[in-house]
Structure formats: C-alpha cells, structure tokens
C-alpha cells in the first residue's frame, strides 16, 4: 500500500473516533442501588440517586460535597435553577421531594402517584413532571410555588421523558413501545405514536432544533422520531442494556449508556434524518445510567460491582438477588 493511501486511512480512522475516554473514577461511599443522575452545568455539580439519598458531587474536583438524605427509594432528580430548586422522585414514598439547590436542605414534599420514576423540568410551563411507573400517570408540580399542578393519565408504563420547550412533553411508554405527546399546560395527552421496530424504550433525549426525539430501546437499537408527526425516520444500532439517552447540541452527538454490554454508544446526527455510529466506547458492565454536562461535554455514569445471588430461600423460582460489593459504587467520568 502506498504511504499516501495509508496516511488517508489513518486520518479517516482518527476522525471516526469520538474522542471519549475515561478521565477519572469518583468513589462514593455507601452500598445502595442507583438509578438516574443529572448535572447542573452552571455549577458542575452532579446529583446522583443512591438508594435513600442523593449524593452531590463536585464534577471538577471529583469528590462528594454533600448529601440529601431521609428518603425511601430515589429514582431521579430534576433541576429548576431559576427558582433555586431541585426535585427528587422518591418512589418508595410516592412523592416528589423539593430541595434548595444552594444549601441542599429539603424544603417540601408533593404527593405523586405510585412509584414516581423519571422526573424532568419543563421550562415552558415552569412545571416539573414526575412519571409514575406503577400508576400509569404523570404528576405535574408548579416549580415556583412547590405545589401540585395536576395529573396526566397515561396508557401504559412510562419511562424517560423530554420537553421541547414549546409546551410539549414526550414520554416513552415501555410496555406499549410507544411515545406519548403531552400538552404540558393543559395536562392532556395529544398523541400516541408507535416506535416500531423499536421495542421497550427506556432512555429519551431530544434535539429541539431539528425536532427529533431519540429513544433508546431494549432490542439494541435507538429510534429517531419526528416530534411533530410521530414518524420514525431512522433507527440506529446500539449496545445492549440501554437505560439512558442524552443529546449534546454542541457536538451533535447522541449518547446511549448500555449497561449489559458495558459500552457508551456514540452516534452523530449527520442531518435530521441521517445518523451514524461513531464508536462504542468501553465503560463498565452495569453502567446503564448517565448524565451529560452540556458545558464541558463530559459524561458521568453511575456504576458498582454487583454480585448476583440465588433467589431467596424457599423461592426457587424467584428472581435472582443482587448485592453491591462494598466500596465499589461511584461515577465514571468520560470526556473528549
């Protein structure tokens, strides 16, 4: 092979890589299980669900700087910086917990449905939406007043959601393999659209400029949907075990954290209807949830070493039990 041709291949291979690599591992004390996490880009703080508490991590220093405790089973955290408030979905207590973003002190609770899971903030209506996994509904909270704004009845089990900033919230319905479009002011379902061939969607993100919704699905693919028509315009292969999907408007990357394979699938939005897999970055098995700092473009993934135990005594057909190996929980930070 000629040197010039070889050089072109090397250059092409370099450009085909996202640049994402592990920057550090941040240890977090405690052996509770985890779910969603989120980042405040203005402060570089990472809010991590961890059993009965939220661990607050300084993303720059890589250390825990605070905790929000006294809850039962935390799923997610949403931030409304304009009101200096954060909101926690406590699935064990069936409520949304409100806290002060600066002091981290809890300041209130709002009753929700059964097992509030995903929680997001909709800037258009100044409302927080908590999606109740076991009562097929969404609880809307007035972020400024800290009071219940209403409830949306859904048809199926909600997973993650995204807001378009124009008065619409979209949510994955896992057991129906659908996306529901909600009027976030009127609190009513406007449309429900099939995701086929995508099955059992979990993670969701959105490019609000191109009006494209990204749904990470259980059958190792990501669906791209037109947010106005509900048409699936593309599907992209991803790793196995996805649970979180993020979109970075600065790089046009769509990111899927796939815990079963232990990879971060990096996809580039070439155009609104065309997408290409850039690479699958090795993370760690079990790293299924993540959060993106849109300012630095760094990604934080929650993970721990988990031991699989046999079903409880007397329940031979029960589910295998899981136990976190002590001292192994923390965050993996990946950057470019």
Identify the residue ranges that each predicted region occupies:
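Predominantly soluble domains enriched in secretory-pathway, periplasmic, or organellar proteins
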Residues: 15-336
């Amino acid at each position: 092979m000629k040197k010039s041709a070889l050089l072109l291949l090397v250059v092409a291979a370099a450009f085909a890589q996202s640049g994402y690599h592990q920057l550090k591992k941040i240890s977090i004390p405690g052996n509770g299980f985890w779910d969603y996490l989120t980042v405040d880009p203005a402060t570089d703080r990472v809010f991590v669900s961890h059993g009965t508490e939220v661990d607050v991590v300084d993303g720059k220093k890589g250390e825990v700087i605070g905790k929000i405790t006294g809850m039962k089973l935390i799923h997610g955290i949403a931030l409304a910086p304009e009101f200096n408030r954060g909101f926690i979905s406590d699935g064990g207590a069936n409520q949304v917990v409100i806290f002060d973003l600066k002091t981290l002190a809890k300041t209130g609770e709002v009753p929700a449905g059964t097992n509030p899971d995903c929680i997001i903030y909709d800037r258009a209506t100044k409302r927080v939406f908590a999606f109740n996994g076991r009562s097929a509904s969404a609880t809307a909270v007035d972020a400024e007043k800290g009071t219940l704004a209403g409830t949306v009845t859904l048809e199926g089990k909600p997973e993650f959601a995204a807001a378009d900033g124009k008065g619409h919230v979209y949510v994955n319905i896992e057991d129906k393999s659908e996306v529901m479009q909600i009027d976030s002011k009127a609190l009513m379902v406007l449309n429900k659209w099939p995701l086929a061939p995508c099955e059992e969607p979990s993670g969701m993100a959105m490019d609000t400029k191109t009006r494209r919704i990204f749904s990470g699905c259980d059958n190792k693919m990501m669906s791209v949907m037109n947010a106005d028509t509900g048409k699936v315009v593309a599907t992209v292969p991803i790793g196995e075990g996805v649970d979180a999907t993020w979109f970075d408007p600065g790089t046009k990357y769509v990111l899927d954290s796939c815990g079963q394979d232990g990879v971060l699938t990096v996809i580039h939005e070439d155009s609104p209807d065309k997408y290409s897999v850039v690479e699958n970055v090795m993370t760690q098995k079990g790293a299924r949830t993540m959060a993106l700092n849109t300012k630095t473009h760094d990604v934080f993934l929650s993970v721990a070493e988990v031991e699989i135990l046999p079903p409880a005594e007397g329940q031979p057909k029960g589910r295998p039990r899981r136990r976190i190996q002590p001292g192994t929980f923390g965050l993996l930070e990946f950057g470019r």
